[in-house]
Structure formats: C-alpha cells, structure tokens
C-alpha cells in the first residue's frame, strides 16, 4: 500500500517532534515499560527448539471449531482425508494471521509512525507503536516457521494458490470509493485498530486448546500474549488521535468501524472449499453451500470484546452501527 501513499516518503524526523499536551497516558507508559519482559521476540527467540514433541497422531487444528465438522459428507471421508483438512486449515490459519499483520496492522502502524494524524508525532505514541511493529515482524516469523515445519513433518509438497485475505479485499473495496487521501488514511487506521483489538480472539481459539499439537498452542499463546498488550496500546493510541481529529475525520472513523468489524469476522468460504478439495473430500461444494445457508456459518470471529472496549473509550457506543455479541467464555478478555 505504500506505493499508493507518496505522503509517507518523508520520515517523522524531517518534521521534528513535540510532546503533545495531554498525552501522558499511564496505561501507555506502563505497556511501553513492560515490553522487555513481555515481548515474545525478546523472551522466546529460540522457539525453533520447541518442535521435538510433535506427534503425527495429534491433529494440527481443533476439530471443535471446524464449521463443517458434523456435516455427513465430511464425516464420511477417510480419516487421512479429514486429517489433511485439519492440517490445511492450520496452515491457512497461519497464512491468515501473517496476511493480517502485513496487509492490515502494519500499514496502520506505518501511518502513525509517519505522523499522518495529529498527535502521532508524540514520543510515547511512537515508542509504543514501534515496539508493536517489532513484535509483528517476529509474529510473522513464528507463523512462517509453523507453516514450514508443518509442511516438513506432514510431508506436504504442494499447496493450491489461496484467495486474497478477505479482510483486505473488503478494505480495498472501501478505499476504492474514497477519493480523498485523508479519508483513505482513516480507513487504514480503523482496519488496523480493529485487527489489533480482535486478532486475540482469533488466536485464543487455538491458544487454550489441549487437543492439538502442543507447539501450535505455544505459538498462538505467545502471539496472544503480545496481542493482548497491543490491543490495549491501540485503544490508548486511537483515543489520543481521535481526540485531535477534526469533525470530518471523526465521521469517517465512525462510518468505517462497523464495516471493518464485519470484514474481520468473515469466514472465507472459498478458502474452506480449497481445503476440502485439496484433501479430496467428496461433495465439497455441497458442504460449503450448506455452510453458506447456515446462520453464523460465514462468521469466523465471534468475540469483539477488545473492539467494543475501544468504541466505549471513544464514547461512540450509540454511534457505531454494529451488534456486538455477548462475550464468549473462551474470550481472552474473560477474567480467569
């Protein structure tokens, strides 16, 4: 996306900087100071050594969250075919996480680091966002490693081309209808903020699952720990930026929020069809067709607690047109 945004060519140093009045968030300061103790990149860089316990009889992905797990045609498939689907869904899960980091979260962080929004030149905001960017690079590495090791251990020699990340497709559609650069910047910021406040719900689906490969749970647990902090950072940063936006920018942010929430929650049925076909499951089209007609069958993420907190912090409870569901028991935001 950078090539579409020439205004990012100048670094923040070229403009100087100033501590913004009112940006002294105790929460943000605490999160910045905790980074050396919390960040996976600092404390778990030797993750490559954790693969010794891989057991080929243990599934790669939780059957419980497979949306077609109880479909008669899936149950009628051979055990090795069902296992191949679970492995493919684990690889696809990692691919989705990587794409979310690279296409959604990092471009939003880049806008903040380049001082695009009033208040984003503040040193505390810059430091917190830069720490998050370092984290995201390591997360991408962890999930790339997960894909490579799974391919090696499961002896998978090929994978069909995958569809573009559905969340990003929805963002590009929104950007195409926005003639003004400032409005496109707001949309990118909102998509990134939603990703960073909701991705922990996606990670929690696997992080606390005891039925899958221990290494898969470890990777998602480490990522979840970082993203829990990122969610809090993003809430604080967006609140500070929103307070300094003009009315046009604020209205654009409110318009984008529900669209971004729906986009992040969406289950890409075309990706599921690819996994079923790759495993040779008979009736793959019928399985996906039945899923499409099922209530909730097209929704992957069902926990929006982090995004809901952001909306509340912005004072937009009544302005954002989105039906937030009840927080599920497995939510990372549920007190333990």
From Swiss-Prot:
Phenotypic consequence of residue 226 to A: Loss of activity
Gene: aurF
Effect of residue 264 to A: No change in activity
Organism phylogeny: Bacteria, Bacillati, Actinomycetota, Actinomycetes, Kitasatosporales
Catalytic activity: 4-aminobenzoate + AH2 + 2 O2 = 4-nitrobenzoate + A + 2 H2O
Assembly description: Homodimer.
Record-given protein name: 4-aminobenzoate N-oxygenase
Binding-site positions, Fe cation 1: 101, 136, 139, 223
EC number(s) on file: 1.14.99.68
Organism for this UniProt entry: Streptomyces thioluteus
Cofactor: Fe(2+)
A Pfam family annotated for this UniProt entry: AurF
GO molecular function, one term: identical protein binding
């Amino acid at each position: 996306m950078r090539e579409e945004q020439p205004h990012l060519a100048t670094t923040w140093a070229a403009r100087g900087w100033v501590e913004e009045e009112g940006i002294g968030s105790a929460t943000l300061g605490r999160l910045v100071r905790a980074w050396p103790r919390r960040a996976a990149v600092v404390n778990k860089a030797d993750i490559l050594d954790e693969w010794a316990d891989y057991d080929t009889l243990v599934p790669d992905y939780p059957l419980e969250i497979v949306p077609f797990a109880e479909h008669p045609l899936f149950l009628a498939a051979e055990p090795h075919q069902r296992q191949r689907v679970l492995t493919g869904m684990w690889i696809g899960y990692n691919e989705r996480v990587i794409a979310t980091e690279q296409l959604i979260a990092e471009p939003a962080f880049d806008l903040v680091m380049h001082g695009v929004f009033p208040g984003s030149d503040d040193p505390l905001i810059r430091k917190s966002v830069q720490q998050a960017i370092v984290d995201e690079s390591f997360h991408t590495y962890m999930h790339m490693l997960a894909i490579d090791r799974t391919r090696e251990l499961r002896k998978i020699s090929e994978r069909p081309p995958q569809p573009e990340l559905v969340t990003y497709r929805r963002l590009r559609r929104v950007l195409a209808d926005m003639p003004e650069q400032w409005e496109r910047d707001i949309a990118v910021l909102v998509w990134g903020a939603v990703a960073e406040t909701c991705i922990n719900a996606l990670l929690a689906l696997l992080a606390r699952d005891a039925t899958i490969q221990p290494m898969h749970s470890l990777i998602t647990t480490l990522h979840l720990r970082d993203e829990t902090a990122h969610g809090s950072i993003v809430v604080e940063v967006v609140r500070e930026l929103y307070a300094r936006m003009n009315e046009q920018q604020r209205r654009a942010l409110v318009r984008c929020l529900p669209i971004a929430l729906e986009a992040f929650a969406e289950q890409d049925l075309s990706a599921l069809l690819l996994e079923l076909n790759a495993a040779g499951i008979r009736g793959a089209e019928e399985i996906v067709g039945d899923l499409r007609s099922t209530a909730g069958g097209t929704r992957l993420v069902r926990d929006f607690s982090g995004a809901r907190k952001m909306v509340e912090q912005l004072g937009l409870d009544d302005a954002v047109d989105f039906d937030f569901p009840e927080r599920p028991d497995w939510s990372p935001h549920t007190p333990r």
